[in-house]
A protein has these predicted regions:
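Core catalytic lobe of class I
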Residues: 3-199
């Protein structure tokens, strides 16, 4: 399985490394030169060098839309600009995925002017309608670093989020899900219910 994990979106490293693929201009004609290789660089540029239909799985957690300074060039993105910023990367992810490939997007939303901004949901719609992804499932990742809390700002109270989203997209309709690694045995009550001996 060829997996691609895009974690750092814009690093201070200007080109793909592995000794700059033997110090030449990087042009990857096959996936073999990057197997088992740690690659750093601007993810959009790195993706452009990866052959089409060559990756089975992509996992990414792009920067938050909070105008946070990550210490890198062009690293702060506002919620209003987020969808347009991400879509070119989404198109490249779609291109490099095999027809049976999957893509997990870990993303968080943002409250702006007292209301939850809708950029996450707009991004989901556009990734499916414009890029061609299929949304297989959404998952909630509980983040213990941000415990639930209540806070008030400007007279409005609300609970603080303690989760982020993980959206599972597929490129085509023939995707794979391995259930066995996460299965748990049924409880006694559930087994009785399934056997028709309980309510």
């Amino acid at each position: 399985m060829n997996c691609l994990i895009l974690w750092s979106w814009k690093l201070a490293v200007p080109t793909i490394t592995k000794a700059n693929i033997n110090r030449g201009v990087v042009k990857l004609k096959t996936i073999n030169p990057i197997l088992n290789t740690f690659i750093t660089g601007d993810c959009e540029q790195v993706l452009k060098e990866i052959p089409s239909d060559s990756i089975d799985f992509v996992l990414t957690s792009p920067p938050y839309a909070d105008k946070r300074d990550y210490g890198n060039e062009n690293s702060s993105i506002s919620p209003d600009e987020y969808v347009e910023w991400f879509l070119p990367k989404g198109r490249e992810i779609y291109r490099v995925l095999k027809p049976t490939g999957s893509f997990i997007l870990n993303i968080s939303d943002k409250v702006v002017d007292g209301f939850q901004h809708l950029y996450v949901f707009e991004l989901l719609l556009r990734l499916c309608k414009e890029v061609g992804f299929h949304l297989v499932r959404d998952y909630i990742w509980y983040n213990p670093a941000t415990p639930p809390n209540v806070y008030s700002r400007g007279g409005y109270g609300r609970t603080k989020k303690s989760h982020e989203y993980c959206f599972w997209f597929s490129k085509g309709s023939d995707w794979t899900f391995e259930l066995d690694p996460i299965r748990k045995p049924y409880s006694k009550d559930m087994q009785k219910y399934l056997d028709g001996k309980g309510k």
